[in-house]
């Protein structure tokens, strides 16, 4: 419909500064393939009206005309939005996240900033490694669970050999401790660095009865079976000295049955702790999702909020401060917190958590667990990012031919085959997910395919194809945000379908059992992610054809193109508008890539995905 091309985005190349304070002047730019008669930035003002300001031509950039203008951003904490208008041959156009249109873009499609947004800027340039602590590595044989030490939920503590397969829940009752510990994580710091890891996400480590530790007994202390409080302080110190941040998992939604708070509540119905829970008339307690070992916490209690996140010595503040000094909280079942019956306090709780955490650490990262579209929580006042199942994991699994977990039995653990998504569907789904999130928060999403709550994709033999899987992983590494690698995926760790237990096998440390090809691939992706320019680079998700899509990341000087393919041997073309393309190099994959004008011509083998680097 339109002969010209245009591109702008909330990224380091088009908005400066990217995280302004209220009242600060921001330079905003756009690239156009032709020289219009006039280009105008239409932007919010503190009058409540949209003003227009003519943009100045700055010269040519990668074959396009660059126009820029500086404007003051408005009220602290409120969205500052804008779009562009221009005239070619007497005909007006508009440009927004919707692309080029003849109509004025709606508010939801306008570009936006949140002035004064306090953000964890380190996230966008990080690569994360998720660790299930009991199953990663044993570093201190003097700590850990003992065989038959106690009984819990109908089971008794067992200590299998490291090479034993985990039993199903009905046999183990989540009491099978392999005795991985925090020192074991410290001991593997060089291994983590070899993967390009700069952040680790640990599943819960608080004092608990079960191996998954979501049934917290005491939030104020680290489980002695993992080494206790000193082990956390020591581990964080070691990781920080090696450039690795630490994300801890916390479920403020519920405790365990043996929680110190619940014990006091049951002993004395007049106690403060009694108000922390939802007690029924028969004296029993309401539990999250009716899981009898996970009694739900009640956030209409002001004192509970004080203990959990308000007080200087509250749980969530304590571990952000020395001697622990963690960097982030992963927020378990976060859309469900504060919700039961007439209590609908979820957003209120998280807004207060954010305010309180930022009072002690300005760059703390708050990442929610949400399997759906998180747009309502991603407006700068609740979470920084989410475990991005919606915009990465669920889409990439569908691309590889696995039915979406919410359409399959056992929440996806008994995975089912389905017709693969096309390149058009993948690109459409990813773009919709990205456009729904507040523009600055795009860079704080935690992108993933596998986790402790999903079957490991490479263990699903009905759909797994090594070459197609590599392409999906490549896309995960290149999407804006932080890629998250689940421990052991890089070496093809064993596992099974059907339950969470099948995704929580002990880490394989015997190198003769490693998938060296997959390990080499992950190391190559980790190395690519370390490019300093990549964190806040612009992005495009492009449909190539039915069996290919592309993730493009770029600045005015550097670019990566991840061409993800599950089709036959062929040649394809990609539009390189706004990208630097003087020099071209294939970083990973087999094929040929060359530029002709502002097009990239790529030839590749069947099911071969390619990562291409370009620069000027």
Placement of each model-derived feature along the sequence:
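Conserved alpha/beta catalytic core and glycan-binding cleft of carbohydrate-active enzymes
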Residues: 121-123, 262-264, 268, 316, ...
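C-terminal beta-strand-rich structural cap/linker in extracellular carbohydrate-active enzymes
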Residues: 34, 596-616
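Glycan-association/targeting regions that enable binding to alpha-glucans and other polysaccharides
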Residues: 1-129, 198
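Aromatic- and carboxylate-lined catalytic core of secreted/periplasmic carbohydrate-active enzymes
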Residues: 503-543
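Carbohydrate-binding surface patches
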Residues: 542-579, 610
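Conserved, mostly hydrophobic/aromatic
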Residues: 30, 131, 192, 202, ...
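Beta-strand-rich binding/interaction modules
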Residues: 36-46, 80-82, 569-590
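Substrate-binding/active-site clefts of carbohydrate-active enzymes
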Residues: 132-198, 205-324, 349, 353-359, ...
């Amino acid at each position: 419909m339109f002969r010209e091309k245009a591109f702008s985005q909330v990224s380091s190349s088009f908005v400066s500064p990217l995280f302004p304070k209220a009242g600060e002047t921001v330079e905003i730019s756009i690239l156009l393939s032709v020289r219009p008669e006039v280009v105008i930035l239409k932007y919010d003002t503190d009058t409540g009206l949209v003003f227009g300001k003519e943009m100045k031509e700055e010269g040519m950039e990668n074959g396009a005309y660059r126009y820029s203008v500086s404007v003051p951003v408005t009220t602290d904490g409120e969205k500052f939005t804008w779009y562009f208008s221009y005239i070619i041959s007497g005909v007006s156009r508009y440009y927004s996240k919707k692309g080029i249109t003849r109509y004025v873009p709606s508010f939801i499609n306008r570009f936006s900033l949140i002035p004064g947004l306090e953000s964890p800027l380190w996230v966008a340039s990080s690569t994360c490694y998720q660790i299930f602590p009991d199953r990663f590595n044993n570093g201190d044989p003097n700590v850990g669970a003992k065989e038959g030490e106690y009984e819990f939920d109908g089971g008794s503590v067992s200590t299998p050999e490291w090479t034993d397969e985990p039993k199903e829940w009905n046999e183990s009752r989540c009491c099978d401790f392999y005795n991985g510990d925090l020192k074991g994580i410290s001991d593997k710091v060089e291994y983590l660095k070899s993967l390009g890891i700069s952040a680790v996400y640990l599943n819960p480590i608080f004092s608990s009865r079960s191996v998954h530790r979501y049934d917290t007994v005491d939030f104020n202390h680290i489980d002695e079976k993992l080494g206790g409080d000193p082990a956390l302080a020591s581990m964080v110190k070691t990781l920080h000295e090696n450039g690795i941040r630490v994300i801890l998992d916390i479920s403020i939604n519920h405790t365990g049955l043996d929680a110190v708070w619940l014990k006091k509540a049951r002993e004395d119905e007049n106690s403060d702790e009694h108000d922390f829970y939802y007690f029924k008339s028969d004296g029993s307690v309401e539990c999250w999702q009716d899981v009898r070992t996970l009694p739900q916490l009640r956030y209409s209690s002001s004192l509970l909020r004080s203990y959990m996140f308000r007080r200087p010595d509250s749980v969530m503040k304590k571990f952000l401060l020395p001697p622990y000094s963690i960097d982030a909280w992963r927020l378990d079942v976060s859309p469900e917190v504060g919700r039961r019956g007439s209590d609908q306090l979820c957003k209120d709780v998280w807004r207060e958590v954010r305010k309180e955490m930022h009072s002690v650490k300005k760059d703390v990262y708050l990442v929610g667990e949400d399997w759906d579209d998180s747009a309502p929580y991603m407006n700068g006042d609740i979470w920084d990012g989410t475990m991005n199942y919606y915009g990465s994991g669920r889409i990439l699994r569908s691309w590889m031919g696995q039915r979406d977990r919410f359409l399959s039995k056992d929440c996806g653990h008994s995975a089912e085959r389905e017709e693969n998504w096309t390149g058009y569907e993948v690109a459409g789904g990813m773009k919709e997910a990205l456009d729904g999130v507040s523009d600055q928060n795009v860079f704080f999403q935690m992108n993933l395919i596998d986790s402790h709550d999903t079957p490991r994709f490479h263990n699903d033999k009905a759909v797994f194809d090594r070459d197609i899987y590599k392409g999906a992983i490549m896309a995960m590494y290149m999407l804006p945000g932080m890629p998250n690698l689940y421990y052991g995926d890089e070496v093809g760790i064993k596992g099974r379908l059907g339950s969470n237990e099948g995704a929580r096998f002990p880490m394989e440390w015997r190198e003769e059992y490693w998938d060296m090809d997959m390990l080499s691939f992950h190391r190559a992706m980790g190395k690519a992610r370390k490019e300093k320019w990549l964190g806040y680079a612009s992005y495009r998700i492009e449909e190539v054809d039915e069996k290919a899509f592309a993730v493009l990341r770029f600045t005015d000087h550097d670019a990566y193109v991840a061409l993800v393919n599950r089709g036959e041997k062929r040649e394809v073309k990609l539009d390189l508008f706004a990208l630097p393309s003087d020099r071209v190099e294939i970083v990973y994959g087999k094929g040929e890539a060359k530029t002709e004008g502002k097009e990239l011509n790529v030839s590749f083998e069947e099911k071969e995905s390619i990562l291409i680097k370009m620069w000027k």
